[in-house]
């Protein structure tokens, strides 16, 4: 199989990863809460009824923001039912999932659960804008966040929570575009109530972060029009707009299922374009970020039959999908899609956390175990913090019925302080290993710390109660890093995490911009004897490539795969860098316009610049001669030979210098 390739350079980044990208979701649905995170009679339960075995797995998973209480559940949610003494809390019908809600796990228990996860866990609270409105949202905000001295804040203290909950991130309803939603609204109706709620909540706390409801999927008939209408009302009042997407194979189309991230990336880019279009129309400098607060692999087609058969039970077994290796590979590819858009996707919530389409499964009174999807998420959360590098893959492709031609390789990379890089990669091929070659430019990394893969000879292999460790990541041999080239072989249908690092982590990282010129004493010239050992190629490189990257970027140089660059349309090889530098040389060349039929074959520079008449192509070329190494054996400071200036055939070499325009 042809080798897949891409280049990594810290000068070309997407953006910093927001820790909220590794959020999750706890909804009062099925066994997510009851016998999931909360089971008072369990052998590992603490005094609050929280399962300690589940808490340990949640910490290992690396979850940050946790969205609560829904989901469809929130459109019938009365927050007052979930506070106060447990014995006084009412039982309610949950219309969304045809279940009975006991309210034994409520707002206080949710905050306690987050505190026990650790300081990285952040509340993300949804308010009911389906059957309720502005007043109820304000009362919930006052109860949760106001310090003291009001009826609702004092009521919270009476309930045992003297300190405010400090909820900063709020969702203004859930999936209000969906006809299945209790209290479904049109975009105009929802936009007005969301704007009123946001404006009022900011009167209590101007620093709250608010998420407006976007479309429930890219396939919705109102997609894009919904976002545009809602943002027209709320653009200056909210910080994020939500996206929801779930994927499953349809009619046995596995190839399209494996390329599901193609749809997710398209979804993200279309919503970004819509948001920016609205901002431009409103002449606003503000950018709306994206909250992808529901995403997963979900075999949704069987859900309707499960729900319609229920007769209002408590915590029924619903949506308990058991994930295979293939599901985990698609899941990992969705994670890669989120990381590749980290500049605009600043919040993401895996739906859900326990039992319900979840990476963690439990048995009432029994153990908890990890699903196959647990491992890509935990590795991405652990090693995917930092700056996402811009990855443009050159990969073999395959055909899909749904998305057309798709790459076999889906990849991204995250750099931390230029001391380590983690490559996350998925091989979508079901039949063959995929050779991978990565060029590391501007990254002084020399060793592979770990190459871990999630794959199996049986793509349908799963972890179950009987075999909880049937599928686990395994180390991969043969991955190497030499002379700035990372090479690996990605197993068929696999999720891969490859970590590379600097062998000298004790040294402080270089500050951005440091080393923009050579100020030290130049080393002695290399020996002229042909028998002398050749110096290490890495020793001839610049001690810092930040200056190189900045100057090339300033000259509008586009980097191409594997160390090639393009300067205004002219592909050139990057120069070899040495401690002995020559200054940059700038030359300008005017290209004469192509002669028209019947016109003279040569024209003067003056004629070439006359607008109209002949061809209007008056192209000015800006050519950069970078630092060049002095000739071997020469004294320091000896100028390097000047290259001949390239001009297009027929161009005038005597053209006057002029400024470049692009």
Swiss-Prot record:
Its catalytic activity?
Hydrolysis of terminal non-reducing alpha-L-arabinofuranoside residues in alpha-L-arabinosides
- Active-site residues, as the UniProt record annotates them: 175, 294
What Gene Ontology terms for biological process does this UniProt record contain? arabinan catabolic process; L-arabinose metabolic process
Q: Where is the composition biased (Low complexity)?
A: 519-533, 590-603, 628-641, 649-662
SMART domains registered for this protein in UniProt = Alpha-L-AF_C (SM00813)
Enzyme class comes to hydrolase
InterPro entries assigned: Alpha-L-AF_C (IPR010720), Glyco_hydro_b (IPR013780), Glycoside_hydrolase_SF (IPR017853)
Q: Where is the composition biased (Basic and acidic residues)?
A: 537-547
Name the residues that bind alpha-L-arabinofuranose. 27, 72, 174, 246, 294, 352
Whether Cell membrane counts among this entry's keywords is no
Q: Which UniProt keywords apply?
A: Carbohydrate metabolism, Cytoplasm, Glycosidase, Hydrolase
- What is recorded on activity versus pH? Optimum pH is 6.0.
Q: What is its EC number?
A: 3.2.1.55
Q: Which Pfam families match?
A: Alpha-L-AF_C
Tell me the superkingdom of the source: Bacteria
Could you say which protein family the record assigns here?
A: Belongs to the glycosyl hydrolase 51 family.
Extract the PANTHER family matched here. ALPHA-L-ARABINOFURANOSIDASE C, ALPHA-L-ARABINOFURANOSIDASE C-RELATED
Q: What does this protein do?
A: Involved in the degradation of arabinan and is a key enzyme in the complete degradation of the plant cell wall. Catalyzes the cleavage of terminal alpha-(1->5)-arabinofuranosyl bonds in different hemicellulosic homopolysaccharides (arabino-oligoxylosides, branched and debranched arabinans). It acts rapidly on the short-chain arabino-oligoxylosides from digestion of xylan with xylanases. It hydrolyzes slowly arabinan and arabinoxylan from wheat and rye flour.
The entry describes its oligomerization and partners as: Homohexamer; trimer of dimers.
Question: Protein name, please?
Answer: Intracellular exo-alpha-(1->5)-L-arabinofuranosidase
